[in-house]
Every structure is written in C-alpha cells, then in structure tokens.
C-alpha cells in the first residue's frame, strides 16, 4: 500500500486542495495498486485505465483554475450494478455479456459531476444475489483479511464484496455499493470498513440494475465514517427519473461528525439476541453499548416483536420482485443470446446458460410465491408482515428512541468455498439475519467496525435510524469509531 493510496478521502481532498499532490499522481498510484493486486483479490472486473487518467487530468485542470468540486480528483470504484456509459455493466452475470450502456446512472453521474475519478467496475454477487461474493460469473472475491497464522482465503461478504475488498485493500479511495438485504453493511463488517444503507428514496435507483425494487438502495463503502459521509453527500439527490426518490434537501453529513451524543437515546432490541450467537458478537455489542454510554448516550431496552419473521418474509418479497425484474433478460436486444429452434426455445436456452445457480434459485422461488395458488399464502402474507415490522420501528421511535444498536453480522468472515454453506442456502441466508429487517422497513442503517475477534478478524456493529436521519447514524457511528479505532489488514497479496 503506497503512501498515496493510504490516504483517506478527507486527507486526499485536503492535499489536492493544497496542491501537495495531483489527481494524476493519486490516480496512477491506485491504478498501479490494482494492477499489482487484482489477480490475487479479484475485486475489479474491469479497470478503466485510460478513462481514469483523462478524468484525473481534467480534475487537475479544474483544481488549477480554482473550480474544484466536492470530490475533485478522488479515485473511486463502482459496483458492477451501476450503469456507466460505454463501460462494462453486467451485474457480474453471463447473461449481460458485452453490455455497455448508452447512459449513466444518477449516482455515478452525481459523483463525476463532483469531480470524482472512475477506476473501474467492481466484482459482486450475480445480480446482487448472495452474501459471500461467490455467485459472480467472474469468480469469487477474496477478503484482504486473513485469520491470525492462517493462509486460508475468506469471503469479503456480499453482494458488494468487490466494493468492500477494494476499499479495505486500498484499491480505491471509496466505492459505490447497493443494499437490498444487507449487501453494503455485511461486507463492510467482514472487511473492517464502513458502509451505510440510506433510507429508501434518499439515493436514486435510476440506472442501477434492479434486484428487488422496493428494497434496493445505493450507498457508499469507505474506510471511515467521515469518508462515508463525504461520499453519501454526493450520491444523494432528488431524481425525477426515480419515482421513489424523495424531495428533501441533502444535509452536510460530514458536519454531523463530532457532534455530541449526550442525551441521545439508543435502543437495544432484545429480539436480536439470537440462539447460537457467538460469544464474541455479544461481547462486541456490549462494548459498543459502553462506548456510547461513556459518550453520554442513554441506553434503553426495546422490543421489536416481529424481528423473527423478517428473514422468511424477506426471502419471499425479494425473490418475488427479482423474478419479475429479471424477466426482461431474454437475449433479444442485448447481452448473451443462445440460438434455439424457435423464439421460446431461444429464451429458455439463453436464460438457462446466462443465469447462475443462485439467481435461478431465486427466480424459481419468486415465480412460485407469485403463482395463482400461492400468492395469498406467501406473497400477500409477507407484505402484511412487512407492515407489522415497520410498525414495530414506528412504535419504538415514537417513544423517543433516536437510534438502535445491534450487531451487523452473526459472525466474522467465513471461509471461501465453505461446503456446508454451499449445500444449504438457508444457512447462507442467515448471514443477513440482522440486516434484512432494515430494508423491509425502508430505514437507514450503518455498519461500523468495532473490534477484532480472537483470530484477528474484523467485527462490525450496526446502527439503525429514523427515516432520513442519517446524520444521527454518522454522529453515533463516529463515536464508536473514535473509541474502537481503525482496522487495516496485513498485506499478503
């Protein structure tokens, strides 16, 4: 990790402003780091060398003229779910082979408008379906962290595994990511990085490949809370092209850092103490409670009675929406096309060859729960449960609770190619046990590293906030970060 790539976004921003470094030097340092490390970590599926250099050159020119944007010259990685004009956008699926969109997603357009530099597209679980980044057509991503005294490869979490691994390994200053059931927060927790899923509607979904439209939200993964706040300010906007986009001013999230949490009411949900939760997770949770208490926050016990139904309801709603969204991939207009004896056969052959195993599984579950005989029994019921989950949170917030503290994941990062998890999808789905509820309720949630386990692997805590009160999350997460310190993996790649 070079001196330049070790800079946080906030530090790089200050050095660029002071003309102590140039955007070109910073970008070249990241491109060299990617070229040296990507064979080992597999975080990038496309590296845009020429585009990055020309964007950095334009940034240097704007800085020289005194016209620098909020992210001028900051090199970022982009999850392969965001449309980037003329650049590989395949949701890491075989079915989108060769697809290069003619348009730019709103999130990336916002970042480029603020002067950020694109380093390339980041690996992810296919169509964002997965918790380990093992379902990608481009192969798994390796976590930059390893257990003490071990050379075994670990997963970086998913679906934004490439984003989290690239940030942790200093292969980008920060990254875009998406979260449908935990895909920002779980990989952030597994890699010692910070990830925030904003309130549903805070960040535009336009130009982002859809998985489950009522749950998907884009957000940043960054090295620390300040960097996440800086990125989120640029990513969030009102967008008339997204009907779920909310017309609320975007606050200066960075300004929330350092504000006192004295008197802030933090809820601890008793339902999150799940059976079989490792002692190290319980210990971490207690540590987080103490950090906030020491900073003057008031800790209160709360109840979210419908928590246990969140995961099963999520795995009905998300596949149902996915089966509908993924019906558009048929090999006719773009992507992979496998010839067939007639049009119906061509559709079948293309979809059979183009989708991976996990995506097929979820399409089939979704089609099943939406089918005539089962719609009421499954889908309708799951939506009713979702309403009850939302009400649980509304009741808690009505009692004056400002934020809720929970573990981010039920364990540290697990081994790559774990046979038990590979053969039992439900065990894999349990990785999202603490995160899916936030998507079901449309609330903001942040994962912040809070310590290392006995094997030296990072563990994260999650803070859940009221709708559109991300500032409170940044404020409280910053307190945890200041108390716990920061965590960087030892370089092996």
Curated annotation (Swiss-Prot):
The family this protein is said to belong to: Belongs to the amidase family. GatA subfamily.
Subunit annotation: Heterotrimer of A, B and C subunits.
Species annotation: Brucella melitensis biotype 2 (strain ATCC 23457)
One GO cellular component term: glutamyl-tRNA(Gln) amidotransferase complex
A GO BP annotation: translation
Active site positions, chain numbering: 79 (charge relay system), 159 (charge relay system), 183 (acyl-ester intermediate)
Name of protein: Glutamyl-tRNA(Gln) amidotransferase subunit A
The EC number(s) this enzyme carries: 6.3.5.7
Top-level taxon: Bacteria
Gene3D superfamilies cross-referenced by the UniProt entry: Amidase signature (AS) domain
GO molecular function: ATP binding; glutaminyl-tRNA synthase (glutamine-hydrolyzing) activity
InterPro entries: Amidase, Amidase_CS, Amidase_dom, AS_sf, GatA
Broad EC category: ligase
Record key words, sorted: ATP-binding, Ligase, Nucleotide-binding, Protein biosynthesis
SUPFAM superfamilies reported for this sequence: Amidase signature (AS) enzymes
Catalyses which reaction(s): L-glutamyl-tRNA(Gln) + L-glutamine + ATP + H2O = L-glutaminyl-tRNA(Gln) + L-glutamate + ADP + phosphate + H(+)
Signal peptide: none
Pfam name, any one: Amidase
Protein's job: Allows the formation of correctly charged Gln-tRNA(Gln) through the transamidation of misacylated Glu-tRNA(Gln) in organisms which lack glutaminyl-tRNA synthetase. The reaction takes place in the presence of glutamine and ATP through an activated gamma-phospho-Glu-tRNA(Gln).
